[in-house]
Amino acid sequence: MILGCALVSHPGSAATTLTVGKASATSDALVPVNVGYELGIFEKHGLDLKIVDFTGGSKMDQAMAAGSLDISAGDGTEMAFIAKGLPMRAVCMIAGPPSFLGIGVPGDSPITSAEQLKGKKIGISSPGSFTEWLARELARNKGWGPDGVTPVAIGNGVVSVTAAFRQHLVDADVGGVATFLNMEEQKIGRLLVPVSSYEGSIASGTFSASNHLIQTNPDAIRTFLAAWLETIGYVRTHKAETVKMESRIDQLPEEVVSKDYDVTIGMFTSDCKFDPAALATLKRGFVELKFVDTPPDMSKLYTEAFLPH
């Protein structure tokens, strides 16, 4: 049983069923899974996807550990938990620079620059998540040290972030640029800075396959990645159609999604290959942020064996 999530399944049947977990329902790096699903691209490749949306990477990791997922879609920090024994391996670098993420503040906040966040409470999706890492990376890059800000787990749903802003449970939040752009329209919050203003090369999105799937059906992984890359090709060349679909999926106005599309479309990789610079950044971060005790051998955490030729 998978708890703390939302499930979407295609009504039809296909040759191979894959349960795909997403760490966030509306993350720009992950929503193309839903786009490809709705377009029938995965089905065309002989796959019947069951998409499970979680409210953070930790809950998704629990489902993977329990054997409930075949594929997980999250961020680069998920690889740290592979080093700690999570039974999966990263198989695709979805996105590089985290252009889809930013730091937002409540609409009535007096904060006008990132420098004013020193010592402040910053909302994150869950402990050990990519958003926690980015909050702590802000402190490190500003010279405040890894404890220069206080991460507060509030989830990554719009409702929970909105409530945290209105009740001033946090001074800021690491979340989707689109979310903050929409909040600005409603005077709930506003975008302070994009994460890319202080964080460069990093694997901001990855697919991982369960060890069970790797051992029992490696061809399904190859097929999934081929369908994914076909989906990204469509997203790149069909802005209007993509914006309309993602607007409905994210429940955001098309004008907001259109602006967000322009900011984020360049982050997707065209071949799923892992960037050495991004891996080096992750390796450093895993230790600095105490996800692991010693630097892991990154080559054991991912494989490019399933990439389409």
Predicted regions and their residues:
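N-terminal signal peptide c-region/cleavage motif recognized by signal peptidases
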Residues: 9-11
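Conserved C-terminal helix/tail region of periplasmic/extracytoplasmic solute-binding proteins
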Residues: 286-309
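Short, glycine-/small- and polar/acidic-enriched structural segments
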Residues: 16-157, 164, 171-177, 191-195, ...
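Secondary-structure end/capping motifs
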Residues: 215-293
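Solvent-exposed, polar/charged alpha-helical surfaces in well-ordered, non-transmembrane soluble domains
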Residues: 39-40, 62, 66, 89, ...
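Bacterial N-terminal signal peptides
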Residues: 1-6
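Pocket-lining segment of extracytoplasmic ligand-binding domains
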Residues: 77, 157-248
